[in-house]
């Protein structure tokens, strides 16, 4: 009986952990804040910032992309950390 209860406890913990989805902001520049659930077990959110002819631009989303010189990027690992 104890073994069965322990097994059920372990299965419950594993299932709850596998169901976790990181949530990141995904609005662009000065738009109203929105969020998205990241897919594929993604563990990072990013905030990318650069300047063009319109001024400073901001992009947010899931992942941690590589960027070219002159583009600032901040990556983080907690829910909605890229605001």
From Swiss-Prot:
Domain of life: Eukaryota
Gene Ontology cellular component list: extracellular region
CDD domains: TFP_snake_toxin (cd00206)
Tissues showing expression: Expressed by the venom gland.
Localization, UniProt: Secreted
The entry's keywords: Acetylcholine receptor inhibiting toxin, Disulfide bond, Ion channel impairing toxin, Neurotoxin, Postsynaptic neurotoxin, Secreted, Signal, Toxin
Residues making up the signal peptide according to the UniProt record: 1-21
Disulfide bridge map: 24-45, 38-62, 64-75, 76-81
UniProt-annotated site: May be critical for toxicity, residues: 54, 57
A single GO molecular function term of this UniProt record: toxin activity
Stated family: Belongs to the three-finger toxin family. Short-chain subfamily. Type I alpha-neurotoxin sub-subfamily.
Function recorded in the entry: Binds to muscle nicotinic acetylcholine receptor (nAChR) and inhibit acetylcholine from binding to the receptor, thereby impairing neuromuscular transmission.
Protein name: Cobrotoxin homolog
Species of origin: Naja naja (Indian cobra)
